[in-house]
């Protein structure tokens, strides 16, 4: 149904906006006539639907935006009036796009809007911010069904997305920008190009993470180990989690992280820790998504493992370097330990020689790290501790102790790589479970002895004893060679009988005098790992 009156009024406004003269007096009159059209399109569903199906209406909106010239320098009053008029047209488009996305897509309205926003000489006054808010809402509606990404408009899209950086964390902009960005990152082609764009860091790190997530959601509380229920996120928090789910599962995320680490450690570290939260807080990943995440996590693990080897070989403690290595290692090991319950990921790790990398890294950490045992502090007394080297000899050297423990806070420093060995052994446990190839490889690479040597309580690696015992159980299960190997170690008193008992085995001497292991039917072995492997 045609609406000649509305078309004429919109045409008059478009001409007024596009007029080069800042003194054009018809703009105020045209604005007054636009007001009722915008209001009725918001309140009257039938009217809104009728207008949305009128191609001439959409054409007038496009013509207005095309010639708005918001890049010109004007006095405050005419600039305000021109922006108010453009905002009115955008609000009308926003209302109509609820009903119809086909016509504005055919007229390339998306590209026209982001081109308009790219022209703005940013002053961040009230009307300018209001115009952007309306524009983001329109862009969200236009991209709900499809992002219809145009490669040539990437620069304008990025400029539009980075605008809120100058708005001092405006919450008014946070929600509409996040909704629009979510629609865009669901498009593989856009995300592939976006993560290579120079503005990606500003948008992803400075605006989305530091601006929106840190200032307007509860998600940083989780990263900072504060209590929060991820099941009851705010709308903005849930939207950001959806955005990041798209980012971390895209093939371009891995090279993006590599580039980011090379020039901005702080941004890389924050993004990596937030990616860890996103990845490990959901079990709804499909096989393709699991693989995409594992690709970047495993690459970081491989490169970090190599750096850890070099660091430990030097034998010189460097807290700054150790802190970075430890932080990276902790994040990716946590992700791999969570994902190792999936068969496809276990196969991925094995295919890319992950067992070798895990065992070698465990060996370097075993030789480098001290075992720590804290005793609970009594009232008005500091906690005491004992430190042991890799040969389980007591360490008394005060300098060495201070290099790994903060005496004042009784906390372990990154130079001792806390929790890393425990996570490696947990991953090995998953890989070894009912897998003869991994069982044998662990023996051949002398990983069996490494796991056995960690069947002790160590405050540097919480739960390492329980995880090691469970891993030993899986290494020995239905594997005569491994059982014989451990039996020979036990005969040399290299293995604690209690460890074998907890793993469900006991040493027996056969009639031929040979030492072997047998399952102890009376041993109650409690599973301390999630063995619901899929």
Curated annotation (Swiss-Prot):
GO terms for cellular component: cytosol. It is found in: Cytoplasm. One of its GO terms (biological process) is cell division. Keywords: Cell cycle, Cell division, Cytoplasm. It comes from the Eukaryota. PANTHER family: ATAXIN-10. Belongs to the ataxin-10 family. May play a role in the regulation of cytokinesis. This is Ataxin-10 homolog. It comes from Eremothecium gossypii (strain ATCC 10895 / CBS 109.51 / FGSC 9923 / NRRL Y-1056). The lineage of its organism: Eukaryota, Fungi, Dikarya, Ascomycota, Saccharomycotina. The gene is CTR86.
């Amino acid at each position: 149904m045609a609406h000649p009156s509305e078309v004429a009024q919109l045409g008059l406004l478009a001409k007024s906006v596009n007029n080069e003269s800042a003194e054009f007096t018809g703009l105020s009159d045209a604005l007054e006539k636009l007001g009722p059209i915008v209001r009725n399109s918001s309140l009257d569903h039938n009217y809104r639907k009728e207008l949305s199906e009128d191609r001439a209406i959409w054409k007038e909106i496009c013509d207005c935006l095309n010639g708005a010239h918001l890049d010109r320098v004007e006095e405050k009053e005419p600039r305000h009036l021109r922006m108010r008029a453009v905002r009115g047209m955008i609000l009308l488009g926003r209302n109509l796009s609820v009903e119809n996305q086909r016509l504005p897509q055919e007229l390339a309205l998306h590209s026209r809007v982001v081109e308009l926003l790219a022209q703005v000489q940013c002053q961040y006054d009230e009307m300018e911010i209001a115009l952007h808010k309306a524009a983001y809402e329109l862009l969200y509606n236009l991209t709900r069904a499809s992002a219809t990404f145009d490669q040539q408009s990437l620069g304008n899209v990025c400029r539009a997305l980075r605008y809120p950086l100058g708005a001092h964390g405006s919450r008014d902009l946070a929600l509409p920008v996040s909704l629009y960005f979510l629609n865009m990152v669901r498009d593989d082609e856009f995300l592939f190009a976006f993560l290579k764009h120079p503005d990606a860091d500003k948008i992803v790190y400075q605006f989305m993470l530091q601006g929106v997530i840190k200032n307007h959601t509860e998600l940083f509380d989780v990263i900072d180990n504060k209590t929060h229920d991820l099941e009851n996120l705010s709308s903005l928090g849930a939207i950001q989690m959806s955005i990041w789910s798209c980012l971390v599962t895209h093939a371009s995320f891995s090279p993006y992280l590599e580039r980011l680490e090379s020039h901005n450690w702080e941004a890389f570290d924050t993004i990596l820790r937030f990616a860890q939260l996103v990845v490990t807080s959901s079990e709804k990943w499909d096989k393709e998504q699991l693989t995409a995440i594992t690709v970047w996590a495993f690459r970081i693990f491989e490169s970090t493992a190599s750096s850890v080897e070099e660091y430990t070989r030097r034998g010189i403690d460097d807290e700054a370097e150790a802190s970075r290595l430890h932080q990276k290692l902790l994040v990716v090991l946590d992700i791999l330990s969570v994902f190792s319950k999936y068969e496809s990921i276990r196969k991925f790790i094995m295919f890319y020689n992950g067992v070798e990398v895990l065992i070698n890294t465990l060996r370097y950490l075993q030789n480098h790290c001290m075992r720590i045992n804290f005793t609970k502090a009594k009232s008005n007394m500091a906690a005491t501790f004992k430190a042991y080297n890799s040969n389980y000899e007591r360490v008394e050297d005060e300098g060495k102790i201070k290099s790994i423990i903060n005496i004042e806070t009784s906390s372990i420093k990154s130079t001792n790589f806390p929790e890393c060995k425990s996570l490696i052994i947990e991953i090995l446990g998953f890989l070894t479970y009912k897998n003869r190839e991994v069982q044998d490889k662990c023996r051949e690479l002398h990983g069996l002895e490494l796991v056995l040597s960690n069947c002790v309580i160590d405050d540097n690696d919480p739960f390492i004893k329980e995880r090691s015992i469970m891993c030993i159980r899986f290494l020995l299960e239905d594997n005569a060679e491994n059982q014989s190997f451990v039996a020979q170690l036990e005969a040399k008193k290299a293995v604690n009988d209690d460890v074998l008992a907890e793993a469900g085995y006991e040493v027996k001497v056969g009639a031929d005098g040979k030492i072997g292991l047998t399952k102890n039917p009376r041993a109650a072995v409690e599973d301390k790992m999630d063995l619901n492997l899929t």
